Amino acid sequence: MDNYTWHSGTLIPSDSPSSIDRSQLYLEILGVLSVVYLLQTLVAYSKSFKAPFVGFRFWYEPKWLVGLRFSQGALAQVNEGYAKYKNAMFKVARNDSDILVIPNKYVEELRSLPDEKISAIRAHIKNLLGKYSTTLILLESDLHTRMLQTKLTPNLGSFIEVIESELLFAMDQEIPANLDDWQSVNVFHIVLRIVARISARVFLGVPACRNEEWLQTSIHYTENVFATVMLLRRFPKWMHPIVGHLLPSYWAIHRNLRTAKRIISPMVRQRRAEEAKRNPDYVKPNDLLQWMMDGANENDGQPDKLAHRQLLLSLASIHTTTMAAAHCFYDLCQHPEYFEPLREEINDVIAQDGGWKKTTLNKMRKLDSFLKESQRINPPSLLAFNRIVSEDLTLSDGTLLPKGTHFSMPSAAILQDNGVEPGADQFDGFRYYKKRLNPEEANKHQFAMTDNNNLHFGHGKYSCPGRFFASNEIKIIMAHLLTDYEFKYPRGATRPRNLTADENLYPDPSARLLMRRRVVAPPQASITPQLVSA
């Protein structure tokens, strides 16, 4: 029987000249695309820094296959590279980019270099596939990071009461009421909602921080960006314009942005209208949005652009803070011997201070140590200090990094190296507390601090500008939840395994803990004490 195919509404033999011509054309197109791809790869390789790749199982294995394995096996690949080339450079093949991993012996000479030489912003945008995640606005200015550094961080002490006030409101809204006995809860989700509320209170003020549509938008924007980036990385760059527009998460990002503009842009216009009246009784709101309005130039100060930057702040703050806090709760339940010492410290410090004061959190050294150890074991990323070389760069030892090189440092492997941290393979919640008992190191080893070994927040000029705010958020949340509630794993359960996506690590958001109200009330000296039911 003859074989037939459908062509222009007619069944024709599949071996007819028309079918053969089309097959030949498809093969020729495929051949041309393959040659173009090969040439692009060879040209890119010829311009790149020569360093050994890790992750290859055999020398002729296609790089895209190694990159595909990197998506779920990055930990093994980075650790392999660190073990083989601890004080040298090596490469990992991520599907969208080869990343040069360099040792932290270069930190000091790189940490203060300007964007004109190595760019943290361009690396950040590249990691987020800026064209598809609405993050290209970061190239226009550093407005929001500048306001975090110059306005929020220096005034964090004055926001302690604001944060605690919003926390108590959020706990009332987000924590189940029937917790007199053990109940199964999703702690990740509870903390996520609390962090979103507190962040909105500091970034936007009242009543915007209570706007449910904004809370949902600020939470889902990050999830949509992450989904879009992870999916697009599985495809070659030339397919991104096609695949990107087919992803539901891509269109959800743009819906999130439209919603942000609809909610925040009128707030900006209303505030400016009030300022224009020159009413002596008008008091400017004390929040990040107002600081951005006051510090913006004509371009940055457009209402829609301010709204856009507020959305980017949620991308940088809500989920990262939530993940760090969730890791802490998972680690506490795995190591329950730390519950009581932490509660004792929290209660003692608050009692000594007569409530929450500007310096209260600084005195909770055991809590700070536990956060830092939890992050050491469960880092947000295997790689940190991400940069793209803006122009050919010669390092102090003569090493030449060509323009366009994407490099980072193996931040997780460094802190899990016994040569850097003795006993690194063991969880020691008070590791850094004990180090600070030495008077010469009393002000070192803090959660939000960075140094040549501790790179999770970056280091130098482009360290995370919101890390001190995030640290305060987590500590206040944990202080209240630990003194008000008890937590444990369900019978037979242990700490959930961390999830991975390329170099990113994150706690299992579906994990459940048992939670119940404590029968001992927190100290009555608290500014707004939360009474605990018997």
Swiss-Prot record:
Its cofactor is heme. The keyword Transmembrane applies. Pfam families: p450 (PF00067). Disulfide bonds: none annotated. GO terms for cellular component: membrane. One of its GO terms (biological process) is secondary metabolic process. Induction: Expression is positively regulated by the cluster-specific transcription factor pbcR. Its main location: membrane. GO terms for molecular function: heme binding; iron ion binding; monooxygenase activity; oxidoreductase activity, acting on paired donors, with incorporation or reduction of molecular oxygen. Heme binds at residue 464. The chain crosses the membrane at residues 25-45. Keywords: Glycoprotein, Heme, Iron, Membrane, Metal-binding, Monooxygenase, Oxidoreductase, Transmembrane, Transmembrane helix. It is found in: Membrane. Pathway: Secondary metabolite biosynthesis; terpenoid biosynthesis. Belongs to the cytochrome P450 family. Bifunctional terpene synthase; part of the gene cluster that mediates the biosynthesis of the diterpene ent-pimara-8(14),15-diene (PD). Within the cluster, the HMG-CoA reductase AN1593 functions in the mevalonate pathway, which produces isoprenoid precursors. The geranylgeranyl pyrophosphate (GGPP) synthase AN1592 is needed in the formation of GGPP, the precursor for diterpenes. Lastly, the pimaradiene synthase pbcA performs the 2 cyclization steps that convert GGPP to ent-pimara-8(14),15-diene. This is Cytochrome P450 monooxygenase AN1598. It comes from Emericella nidulans (strain FGSC A4 / ATCC 38163 / CBS 112.46 / NRRL 194 / M139) (Aspergillus nidulans).
